[in-house]
Amino acid sequence: MKSSDIDQDLFTDSYCKVCSAQLISESQRVAHYESRKHASKVRLYYMLHPRDGGCPAKRLRSENGSDADMVDKNKCCTLCNMSFTSAVVADSHYQGKIHAKRLKLLLGEKTPLKTTATPLSPLKPPRMDTAPVVASPYQRRDSDRYCGLCAAWFNNPLMAQQHYDGKKHKKNAARVALLEQLGTTLDMGELRGLRRNYRCTICSVSLNSIEQYHAHLKGSKHQTNLKNK
């Protein structure tokens, strides 16, 4: 039995014996024979069951270019190392994304050139320069790897910059700034209590955040109680 007869027996319009797949419609048949899973199983099958030198596509890749020109393109694609059971499957492959992508890489690698022309890459260095702007007593030399204020680690400088530009870090930095301002007027005991529960002992009121506490200190009620104390 010839290898072509064996291939036709393995890959029919209604069933793929290599993958044990039932093919109901033409679209399902084309999609299956075009899939990477099918191609991988076919290569593995020919490795385990070599006939007439193995898979035609594999055999032709080891030969010179002049021999490859004599290959029937409706039976195999030497560029993608794939074999076909019919002209319909072959035509679908040549019009598909996988073949087009590999053909572009072979002819001149146009895809990498497009990525270098994008304006995204030159925008990254200026954003990196804005990282040291964040002033904090928790700032460390390796601030592009760790934020002591938020106890956050970073895998790269871009991730660090996104953190410093985020709401969470800015909110924590604002709290630290307020605590530093209040620290000049409060003693250490009051400051420690403030860090825990934001309570004003003069007005006997508890607040939910440092921002509310700071606003309360500037309010008329607190100022009146402070004068009457």
Curated annotation (Swiss-Prot):
GO terms for cellular component: nucleus. It is found in: Nucleus. A zinc finger (Matrin-type) spans 14-44, 72-106, 145-175, 198-228. The keyword Repeat applies. InterPro entries: Matrin/U1-like-C_Znf_C2H2 (IPR003604), ZN346_ZMAT4 (IPR051868), Znf_C2H2_jaz (IPR022755), Znf_C2H2_sf (IPR036236), Znf_C2H2_type (IPR013087). GO terms for molecular function: DNA binding; identical protein binding; zinc ion binding. SMART domains: ZnF_C2H2, ZnF_U1. Keywords: DNA-binding, Metal-binding, Nucleus, Repeat, Zinc, Zinc-finger. SUPFAM superfamilies: beta-beta-alpha zinc fingers (SSF57667). Residues 116-135 are annotated as: Disordered. It comes from the Eukaryota. This is Zinc finger matrin-type protein 4. It comes from Homo sapiens (Human). The gene is ZMAT4.
